[in-house]
């Protein structure tokens, strides 16, 4: 894919995913049937933030030359966004509340996503 199209493509995906997380975490979910699986919400947070960090990595790798700096920026972006969403849940919603365990799951998910990108980068970007 042409470099500029690739940049726009990954930016669009990252923004769409960020919007999807925001909506999913801030809307009233009390009418949604709950899965009868223990800690399913934590697994969802892991998945959301693994994908979040991968998409932002794929966009920002075209903007940031230094690989360690890229990993640090994407990690910090993921953590800050996750904490911001938890803050918004406790401040701006009536049916949602902040949960430290969600923030931890977000951080673990972001770390998993970045570990996958480290493997990808090492294997395919020599």
Which stretches of residues belong to each language-model region?
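Bulky hydrophobic segments
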Residues: 1-96, 100, 107, 111-126
């Amino acid at each position: 894919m042409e470099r500029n199209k690739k940049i726009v493509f990954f930016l669009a995906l990252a923004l769409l995913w960020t919007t999807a997380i925001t909506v999913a975490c801030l809307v009233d979910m009390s009418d949604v049937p709950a899965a009868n699986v223990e800690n399913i919400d934590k697994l969802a947070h892991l998945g959301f933030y693994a994908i979040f960090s991968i998409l932002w990595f794929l966009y920002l790798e075209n903007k940031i030359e230094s690989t360690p700096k890229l990993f640090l920026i994407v990690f910090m972006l993921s953590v800050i966004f996750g904490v911001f969403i938890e803050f918004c849940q406790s401040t701006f919603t009536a049916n949602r509340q902040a949960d430290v365990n969600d923030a931890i799951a977000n951080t673990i998910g972001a770390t998993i996503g970045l570990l996958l990108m480290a493997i990808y980068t090492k294997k395919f970007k020599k």
